[in-house]
Design a protein with these regions (language model features):
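Alpha-helical cap/lid subdomain in secreted, periplasmic
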Residues: 1-122
Length: 122
């Protein structure tokens, strides 16, 4: 299960383009396949604002990256777990009841994510 990208969008280790973030995730999938592991790609969770990076507006970048991931998963016949569509609010962020800081899921959110994942794996 590959759920990655939000820390790169937040530029936690410096700037990285969406294309390079996507390329890194593709590399993870290729490594998994090399070792006979079937990748399961997950969308990046919704986030309107990063609490530690108020100069970055991630919502649109997350949507764009998720579209790239969804298309890649479809092309390669990988399972795609769309957390974003199921969890986003009207601002493309996590609803307040699912997070303390707008970024990290809380226990209630993880329960919902579990069900979304199990449903996708059926």
């Amino acid at each position: 299960i590959i759920l990655a990208g939000t820390n790169d969008i937040a530029r936690n280790t410096g700037y990285i383009s969406l294309e390079n973030i996507f390329g890194n995730i593709v590399s993870m999938c290729e490594l998994a396949k090399l070792y006979k592991i079937q990748p399961v790609l997950c969308s990046v969770l919704p986030c309107e604002k990063y609490p530690h990076r108020d100069n970055i507006e991630p919502a649109d970048m997350i949507i764009e990256l998720n579209e790239m991931l969804k298309n890649y998963a479809k092309k390669n016949k990988y399972i795609y777990v769309d957390y974003h569509s199921a969890l986003k609010n009207e601002y493309n962020g996590l609803p307040a009841e699912y997070t303390k800081d707008g970024l990290h899921p809380n226990k209630e959110c993880y329960k919902i994510m579990k069900e979304i994942l199990l449903d996708a794996l059926k």
